[in-house]
């Protein structure tokens, strides 16, 4: 943040998967000028479908943020008989019409109840991740999930596993095929942004960007994958750990 302020840069903190996490004793999503959380159905806690929260440390934007939530309506003023006014939101490039980002009361209630359980939910995820890390740490061809420390408290949205191709006898693509054959779900969807078709349509040169990002290419194409762990039984976690170790063993033996 100090570097951003030095260069007058606004920091937008994407904390979509990180509700309840901490960095240096500060809650994730509250460090930047703006922070956003997602409560889509695949996140750690949900609002029964879509939903999110936008936070800000920039007080002058708060009135605009509140009005942007629902058609530019100022709910601090009395609205008789639902005869509300649609006002413009003042943006950098001029006024624009707000859309409807409001949610239902049922969704709001469901989210509130889950927020009250966030520590319990994260702890369950942490225990599952801790078990896998303990099982997998004995294999020198694997880099298990980092479990954090006193200054870094993850939310364990997914279990991130990296392999070392030189030691594993193959890269992550071969590993994924073996895990698929064993019926273990993987979620490797965090791809480099420059690989999205929309950026090609905007005229970005995917090949040129890829050549300038060799580490990103190596990690995505050859080294990492993710596993869902929340709600798995001890027997299912056992099976997952066994499948991972067996797959690496097969790769090393060339079978």
Predicted features by range, described:
Residues 1-25, 57:
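Catalytic PLP-binding core of fold-type I/II PLP enzymes
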Residues 8-10, 27, 34, 185:
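Proline-centered loop/turn at the N-terminus of a beta-strand
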Residues 14, 35, 39, 52, ...:
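Generic structural signal for small/hydrophobic residues in well-ordered secondary structure
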Residues 18-24, 31-158, 194:
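Active-site region of PLP-dependent enzymes
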Residues 65, 171-182, 240-245:
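Short amphipathic alpha-helices in soluble, non-transmembrane regions
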Residues 71-86, 131-136, 175-215, 219-225, ...:
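Conserved PLP cofactor-binding pocket of PLP-dependent enzymes
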Residues 148-149, 157-168, 186, 195-202, ...:
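Conserved PLP-binding active-site segment of the aspartate aminotransferase-like
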Residues 246-255:
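Generic C-terminal helix-cap and adjacent flexible tail
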């Amino acid at each position: 943040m100090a570097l951003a302020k030095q260069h007058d840069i606004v920091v937008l903190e994407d904390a979509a998967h990180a509700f309840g996490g901490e960095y240096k004793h500060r809650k994730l999503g509250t460090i930047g000028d703006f922070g956003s959380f997602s409560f889509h159905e695949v996140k750690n806690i949900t609002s029964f479908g879509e939903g999110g929260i936008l936070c800000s440390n920039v007080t002058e934007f708060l009135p605009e943020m509140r009005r942007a939530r629902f058609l530019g309506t100022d709910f601090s003023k009395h609205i008789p008989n639902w005869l509300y006014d649609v006002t413009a939101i003042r943006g950098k490039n001029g006024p624009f019409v707000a859309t409807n980002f409001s949610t239902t009361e049922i969704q709001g209630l469901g989210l509130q109840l889950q927020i009250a359980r966030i520590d319990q939910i994260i702890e369950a995820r942490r225990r599952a991740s801790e078990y896998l890390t303990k099982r997998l740490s004995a294999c020198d061809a694997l880099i298990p999930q980092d479990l954090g420390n006193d200054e870094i408290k993850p939310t364990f949205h997914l279990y991130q596993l990296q392999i070392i191709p030189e030691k594993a006898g193959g890269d992550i693509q071969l590993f994924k095929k073996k895990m698929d054959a064993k019926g273990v779900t993987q979620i490797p969807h965090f791809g480099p942004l420059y690989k999205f078709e929309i950026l090609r349509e905007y005229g970005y040169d995917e090949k040129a960007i890829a050549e300038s990002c060799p580490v990103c290419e190596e990690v995505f194409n050859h080294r990492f994958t993710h596993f869902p762990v929340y709600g798995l039984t001890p027997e299912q976690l056992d099976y997952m750990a066994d499948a991972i170790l067996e797959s690496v063993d097969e790769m090393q033996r060339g079978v």
